A protein has these predicted regions:
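Short metal-coordination and nucleic-acid-contact micro-motifs, chiefly zinc-binding Cys/His arrays
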Residues: 31-34, 66, 102-106, 150-153
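Cys/His-rich microdomains that often coordinate metals
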Residues: 42-45, 74-77, 83, 87, ...
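Acidic, Ser/Thr-rich low-complexity segments on the non-lumenal side of membrane proteins
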Residues: 37-78
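Long, non-transmembrane cytosolic or organellar matrix-exposed soluble domains/tails
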Residues: 138-181
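Short cysteine/histidine-rich metal-coordination sites, predominantly Zn2+-binding motifs
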Residues: 51-62, 85-92, 97-102, 124-138, ...
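Transmembrane-cytosolic junction motif
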Residues: 14-43
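Short cysteine-rich clusters marking metal-coordination/redox-active sites
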Residues: 38, 67-70, 109-112, 154-160
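Feature marks short, highly hydrophobic, charge-poor N-terminal signal-anchor/signal peptide-like helices
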Residues: 1-9
Length: 181
């Protein structure tokens, strides 16, 4: 009984050693919201791949992807999911966080001129300056509208976003002073 238990434990550890990196790698590759062009409507759509299923399929040696969510659902839920070809071709390129990192990485804050080092998906988030002068966190923008919003808005750092939001929400508490420069 003990020898059988030891052999079983060794086999289990070996299987985990081989499969765990494959499963974790597939899960990390396919998690997160992505922007794709819907083949049916030719418009931007925000989709999420079923990352758990992708990880399980990777463990079994397959690469079959399925959508878990789409901004076009429930109206177009019966679609053929042809947009998955875009994700398979470039899984990182269509990730919302990749799109945002590249966009912010090429710019400086519209209000203070500070360069952006990295965007955060939690904590002190970067923001956007609307043409009307209001700032909003990028996380408040619906993913499928992100491309259009990035074309019309300017980047704002967390510090300027907080200061601007306070100034807009409580103008009676703010004294405008002329710049010393």
């Amino acid at each position: 009984m003990t020898a059988l238990f030891v052999v079983g434990a060794i086999v289990s550890v070996g299987v985990l050693y081989v499969l765990l990196p494959v499963v974790v790698g597939a899960y990390r590759t396919f998690r997160g919201t992505r922007l794709v062009t819907c083949p049916e409507t030719q418009e931007s759509a925000a989709v999420e791949v079923d990352a758990r299923r992708a990880a399980l399929m990777a463990a079994l040696g397959g690469t079959e992807l399925r959508l878990q969510d789409c901004s076009r659902w429930p109206e177009r839920q019966a679609c053929g999911q042809e947009c998955l070809q875009q994700i398979e071709a470039a899984p990182d390129e269509c990730l919302v966080r990749t799109i945002l990192s590249r966009w912010y990485g090429e710019q400086v804050c519209a209000l203070c001129g500070a360069p952006f080092e990295a965007i955060e998906s939690w904590g002190h988030r970067t923001a956007l300056l609307a043409p009307g002068g209001q700032t909003i966190e990028w996380s408040a923008v619906r993913s499928e509208k992100l491309t259009a919003v990035l074309a019309t808005h300017q980047p704002v750092c967390w510090n300027c976003h907080v200061a601007e939001s306070f100034r807009q929400q409580h103008p009676e508490l703010v004294t405008e002073r002329p710049s010393l420069h």
